């Protein structure tokens, strides 16, 4: 019921105050001892989620059908183009040597991500009675759907040295440079991806910026870090319109403060037009100038936030070339159930959510990251 209905019922209807508290004109002492045993706490059918279930990373990535497990990349261009030298005694000269571009085959492994749960027939029946959750199956499906997407986002940003082979590949691994492996505390094999050995395949190295170049030391973010990262992607031929930044909430706040302190006045403003006080549930806040320091982009590159971005001391920053990233999907998120107890031979129903595919990177050098930040 609504709050208004509850109040009306409490003061005059089925929950009337006289019924609730036993108010009467006569002195009618009902209890002569502690009545605590007469009370039973009830909890209601609503569960208030205390967890941040916001998941956006999977949604950011374009989706492609899984039509093949491999693809080809060109890692070197034709290299013998040259002018023909004239021969003094002949009209023509010798042609340059023939050559061809270098082409490498890359292959990905299909990953199947599964969230399973089980509800006993007894729990399902009692959820509609007593002090249950109501439709328990619907509740579990909703909450586990959120948990499924949360887990996928967590995989997509897992730090390079903890990526599980059976999970989706990680953007954190894609944006990690093998040549600077010693400064990010990774084993040699941690940075290998698909069938690529990054210690020998230089074409698979992204643009990575360390807070303290050439060192494992941590340092505060600077705008020059961002500029260097962008420059590296531009030099590799990125389409500027395809770039986004992905970072955590703490580094985002550091970036806001940095832009203000460096005099980037376009990043913040006092808005005289928004002088009214805020209002929530009948309570009025303070009136005055509206100060807005939110940063939606840097140099025209949109900024996105995720709680899953790995922290060194503070969250890393990923520069992603979205035109060369995709989720290749073999099976979109699918809900399956087994509710026939004659088949399962137990008094319970089983459920699962399944997503099958893999994170694909078509070009590494236009991806990048800033690491070892501490503010």
Language-model region placement:
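Short, charged/polar, low-complexity loop and linker segments
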Residues: 122-128
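Sequence/fold signature of self-assembling virion shell proteins
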Residues: 4-12, 17-33, 128, 134-135, ...
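Hydrophobic alpha-helical segments involved in membrane association or supramolecular assembly
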Residues: 58, 71-75, 142, 146, ...
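Structured segments of extracytoplasmic/periplasmic soluble domains
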Residues: 147-158, 229-232, 236, 258
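Short, glycine/acidic-rich hinge or "gate" loops at secondary-structure transitions
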Residues: 153-170
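Internal mixed-charge
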Residues: 100, 104-121, 135-154, 249, ...
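Assembly/oligomerization interface modules of large self-assembling protein complexes
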Residues: 30-120, 141-142, 164-165
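Long, repeat-rich segments with strong aromatic
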Residues: 242-250, 254-256
